[in-house]
UniProtKB/Swiss-Prot annotation:
Pfam families: MMR_HSR1, MnmE_helical, TrmE_N. Its cofactor is K(+). GO terms for molecular function: GTP binding; GTPase activity; metal ion binding. Residues 217-378 form the TrmE-type G domain. The gene is mnmE. Homodimer. Heterotetramer of two MnmE and two MnmG subunits. This is tRNA modification GTPase MnmE. It is found in: Cytoplasm.
Length: 455
């Protein structure tokens, strides 16, 4: 158990007015704070309604006090929670009262969760899940984050780590005891176990990718010439009149944003100004901002007015626009206004990039676009039993997979046990980064400072 010499305090509830405000204290002097503020020693894990006292003995507030004796607390230390009225002035008065006591300081962002991690009350993936649960923007995200907090992700990672460790032991035994008559590397066990680990890791990666999509979402930019129907498409996808729609070209001058969910997948939709030669300074700024958003998009919906051209290849429709796009940019061509052209709505899988015919005005073909966007992100829509994952988790899983593949190649091609053992060690190291078993102090600092103060 990690020992901290100082005691920290912070408001655990959001700042602002509220019916209830909670102040959390953690550290070796939490019991002294309880004695000073409550005026008496508190029973462990027992809610007591009493006045909260100032240093002169007068009452500042009244409410519920809870004391948790370490290590049986969230942080693993002595913890005091004071639940009073949630006025911002009152909360500030209470915290200033506590800070006057010797050895108490304000908590850093995420420091309560950091202490819980350092005291082995939860691992790093679970600690991150606390922040993800608080920030969840949908029911699916909240459920996935809670499953991660309960250890669903960590359990899968730990199972992989254990499997890698056992295989390392077997391989290194073969290297260290070459005089044994059994050829450990060629008896099939190592190869079978390695393939099993690789398959299990790939399954975890697929689940983690779904969890990352639920957390991060997809940034989709609608771009094209003026009056192609971009704002109408934004309204159709969001289900409300987010953007003004007129027959006047250039109505949209600035970037418009909407956040929606498709079967639990967050979608950040951005409508941009029509791209053309600017006729004035305001339009020029709008077009510049449009290109800034396009450069940062996960996918661009290239909006085309179907009544102006029969072409379906974007290079034929607008070569200058396509040439300016990043090579790796995901692109979908949207032929709008099928209600006027008479074309059948839906997706055409023959084209590259994909082509979707729809009517942003009537909504025909919008469901095909929604399904297409899910497919583009590899989102299955099945979140039952899944967990939340972050970008760093995906990177660690990818690194581990790469090392296992290298080890497999060395084993199958050269029977190189020493190299396989090293690749297994590196794979184990990357997997352990997810739960914090092997993590740099710098990474821990970046993770916990992104938390709320009081968490």
């Amino acid at each position: 158990m990690n020992e901290y010499t100082d005691t920290i305090v912070a408001q655990a509830t959001p700042p602002g007015r509220g019916g209830v405000g909670i102040i959390r204290v953690s550290g070796p002097k939490a019991k002294e704070v309880a004695l000073a503020v409550a005026g008496r020693e508190l029973k462990t894990r027992y809610a007591e309604y009493l006045p909260f006292k100032n240093e002169d003995g007068s009452a500042l507030d009244q409410g519920i006090a809870l004391f948790f004796k370490g290590p049986n607390s969230f942080t693993g230390e002595d913890v005091l929670e004071l639940q009073g009225h949630g006025g911002p002035v009152l909360m500030d008065m209470m915290i200033r009262r506590i800070l006057k006591l010797e050895g108490i300081r304000p908590a850093r962002p995420g420091e309560f969760s950091e202490r819980a991690f350092m005291n082995d009350k939860l691992d790093l993936a679970q600690a991150e899940a606390i922040a993800d649960l608080i920030d969840a923007s949908s029911e699916e995200a909240a459920k996935s984050a809670f499953r991660s907090l309960q250890g669903a992700f960590s359990t899968k990672v730990n199972e992989l780590v254990e499997a890698v460790i056992h295989l390392r032991i077997y391989v290194e035994a073969a290297i260290d005891f070459p005089e044994e008559e059994i050829d450990f590397l060629s008896d099939g066990k190592v190869s079978n176990d390695l393939h099993g680990i690789i398959d299990n890791l790939e399954a975890v990666r697929r689940e983690a990718n779904q969890g990352s999509i639920i957390r991060e979402g997809m940034k989709v930019v609608i771009a094209g010439r003026p009056n192609a129907g971009k704002s109408s498409l934004l309204n159709a996808l969001s289900g409300k009149d987010s953007a003004i729609v007129t027959d006047i070209a250039g109505t949209t001058r600035d970037v418009l944003r909407e956040h929606i969910h498709i079967d639990g997948m967050p979608l950040h939709i951005i409508d941009t100004a029509g791209l053309r030669e600017a006729s004035n300074e305001v339009e020029r700024i709008g077009i510049e901002r449009a290109w800034e958003e396009i450069q940062q998009a996960d996918r661009v919906l290239f909006m085309v007015d179907g009544t102006t051209t029969n072409d379906t290849d974007p290079k034929d429709i607008w070569p200058d626009f396509i040439e300016r796009l990043p090579e790796s940019m995901g692109l979908t061509v949207i032929r709008n206004k099928v209600e006027l052209t008479g074309e059948a709505a839906g997706i055409c899988h023959v084209n590259n990039p994909p082509l979707i015919r729809l009517s942003a005005r009537t909504g025909e073909g919008i469901d095909s676009l929604r399904e297409h966007l899910k497919d583009c992100m590899g989102f299955s829509g099945t979140t039952e039993g899944g967990f939340m994952a972050r970008r760093r988790h995906l990177e660690a899983l990818e690194q581990a997979a790469q090392h296992l593949e290298i080890g497999k190649e060395q084993l199958e091609g050269f029977m190189a046990g020493e190299i396989l053992a090293e690749e297994l060690r590196l794979a184990q190291q990357h997997l352990s980064e997810i739960t914090g078993e092997f993590t740099s102090d710098d990474l821990l600092g970046r993770i916990f400072t992104s938390f709320c103060i009081g968490k």
